[in-house]
Amino acid sequence: MTATITNKKSCSGSVEAGKTRLTTEWKPESQVPQYVKNELSKPHPNYILAFLNVVQQLKIQRRTGYLDLGIKECESISDHMYRLSIITMLIKDSRVNRDKCVRIALVHDIAESLVGDITPVDPIGKEEKHRREWETIKYLCNALIKPYNEIAAKEIMDDWLAYENVTSLEARYVKDIDKYEMLVQCFEYEREYKGTKNFDDFFGAVASIKTDEVKGWTSDLVVQRQKYFADLTQSITK
């Protein structure tokens, strides 16, 4: 393969990359740490190291929604991605290629290494968020990965697009498990903080889960959560 990665589907699944309106001056290159820029400016850059240094940002960026609730030592983006990937290995549905699920799970939030963890309450609109993520995945694949391994660049791009556009059963499962893992984490924080943090808005994601298997997991989680709060209320009123 020698062609530059120019997949025409945007992360919204319908807008061609060439037609995406650039609503701001934000560019992924502007978010790259200076020491990585210094490496890339060398006559013979170490592209693997540069890419890993960018991905490292996922390990130190904490999840915005939890920070907004005052959970200072909350999980990082990569914490979420790791457990999500583990959960995909547990899928029982025989139609599903679990290895493909793991690949998709590992890259689904990789653009957040430069974009950050933007939430619905942030002042950045959904269209702009998607544009930034699309520009970032193109930058990561074409500018950092492709010079070293063109096949890997295409595979990562394809896996990321599969998730964004939900073009396979595996992508659908990862979408659902992404929400399920978040709900598990929310319930863990609710127990840690003895119900003093309100995660009700997060549990609105239950309605958007599509696959029967993940629906079953989620139903069990919701029942456990309801019992926890019933028991907590009872202990307080005694």
Curated annotation (Swiss-Prot):
CC cofactor note: Binds 2 divalent metal cations. Shows activity with Mn(2+), Co(2+) and Mg(2+) but shows no activity with Zn(2+).
GO cellular component: cytoplasm; nucleus
Domain HD, first and last residues per copy: 77-183
Listed cofactors: Mn(2+); Co(2+); Mg(2+)
Known EC number: 3.1.3.89
Family: Belongs to the HDDC2 family.
Cross-referenced Pfam families: HD_3 (PF13023)
Native organism taxonomy: Eukaryota, Fungi, Dikarya, Ascomycota, Saccharomycotina
Catalytic activity: a 2'-deoxyribonucleoside 5'-phosphate + H2O = a 2'-deoxyribonucleoside + phosphate
Highest taxon above the source species: Eukaryota
GO MF assignments: 5'-deoxynucleotidase activity; GMP 5'-nucleotidase activity; metal ion binding
Further remarks about this protein from its record: Present with 2730 molecules/cell in log phase SD medium.
Keyword list, A-Z: Cobalt, Hydrolase, Magnesium, Manganese, Metal-binding
UniProt binding sites for a divalent metal cation 2: E112, D117, I118
Binding site for a divalent metal cation 1: H80, H108, D109, D178
Protein name: 5'-deoxynucleotidase YBR242W
Biological process, per Gene Ontology: deoxyribonucleoside monophosphate catabolic process
Subunit structure: Homodimer.
Keyword Nucleotide-binding appears in the UniProt entry: no
Function according to Swiss-Prot or TrEMBL: Catalyzes the dephosphorylation of the nucleoside 5'-monophosphates deoxyadenosine monophosphate (dAMP), deoxycytidine monophosphate (dCMP), deoxyguanosine monophosphate (dGMP) and deoxythymidine monophosphate (dTMP).
